[in-house]
A protein has these predicted regions:
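Catalytic-domain carbohydrate-binding cleft regions of carbohydrate-active enzymes
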Residues: 1-166
Length: 166
């Protein structure tokens, strides 16, 4: 796994993630985790999530130890949010910073803009499942109409003096 995806904590670096998130909240901050979801759910990196989703989805979206990313499909989406997102939110994650940059349109649903759909699904999940707070996500611009969902960011930037001088 190349470091751009994954759903579990590196406990060598963060041995007690829930405790860390609580300390951050105790200091008055909100917490967003940056997601690069395109590689799906890997059995090596995220074994508990992989097992739960694989059982629920009956192997439908993956083989060889990986569940592919199929946010277009309601059964995948429900299983993903129930098993992965709810778990992290129960640990203390307040909202999500999606960093989708793989496919402009879905390889499974013709004409469906992937960035727009990620914005729509994550935002509306928060509307439905976290009514105690104002829904918010960070994400890239997903095309016309997507401004209703996310606080946009322009993407990655080079961190050096020539870039600042521009």
């Amino acid at each position: 796994i190349g470091g751009w995806t994954g759903w579990s904590w590196n406990t060598n670096l963060i041995p007690e993630p829930t405790k860390l998130l609580q300390e951050i909240h105790d200091n008055g901050y909100k917490i967003a985790l940056n997601l690069h979801p395109a590689d799906g759910i890997d059995s090596i990196e995220s074994p508990s999530y992989y097992k739960a989703m694989s059982r629920e989805l009956e192997g439908k979206y993956g083989s060889d130890g990986k569940i592919a990313w199929y946010l277009d499909y309601p059964d995948f989406t429900k299983s993903f949010f129930d098993n992965v997102i709810r778990d992290h939110e129960s640990e203390g994650v307040d909202f999500w910073w999606l960093d989708w940059q793989q496919h402009l349109t879905s390889p499974y649903t013709p004409g469906l803009g992937q960035t727009f759909w990620c914005n729509h699904v994550f935002y509306n999940d928060m509307v439905k499942n976290r009514p105690d707070r104002r829904p918010v996500i960070f994400h890239r611009w997903g095309g016309l109409g997507s401004h209703r969902y996310q606080i946009g960011f322009s993407g990655d930037a080079l961190i050096n003096f020539p870039t600042l001088a521009f």
